[in-house]
Amino acid sequence: MKEPSATAGTYDIEEVRRKYIGFETATAKGRYPVEHDAIRRHCHKVDDNNPLFLDSEYAKTMAQGAVLCPPSGWLALYFASLGPWPAVFEPLFPIVPTPGKRIVNMSQEVEWSARIRVGDHLSVRRRIADVFQKAVSLDPQAVWIVAEAIITNQRDEEVCVIRNTMLTHRTPEEQGQGARSKEPG
């Protein structure tokens, strides 16, 4: 299949949709298991004093039986990723061709399906859920990308899906409007 083109005047959103929607990366296992100290530091930073996240003795007496990870998509992604060192570039999604290269993160939502416990070993796979064109005042040919990070535990049970909606747009110069906007008025 020919690679979709994103050059001015030749962008084919339907071709891009056919090629990229449903694209999924291989599952990547996180470098480290879920650790209590990282959870504790996060809770102190955000002033979350829930004993299920902080007190291992208390957590043992509860139905969960262990300290839980707070429902934070970023914490889940941290534990499912390659960790802080050595630094490894992990793109949030495959590079979808678009007419513009400017990116705005429009929204993020997390859908939880299971609890994350200290000691769990998380993994992540990423997929493109949707690509569509929707005009905005910045660019009538803006492209929207919905990318998902699917987090699973060591039993391959899905614990959450982190869904990011991003808008890509062209600059006024890329749209051919740069000359008009610079005219004295």
Language model features: what each stretch is:
Residues 1-24, 107, 111-185:
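HotDog/MaoC-like acyl-thioester-processing domains
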Residues 2-107, 173-178:
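Hot-dog-fold acyl-thioester-processing enzymes
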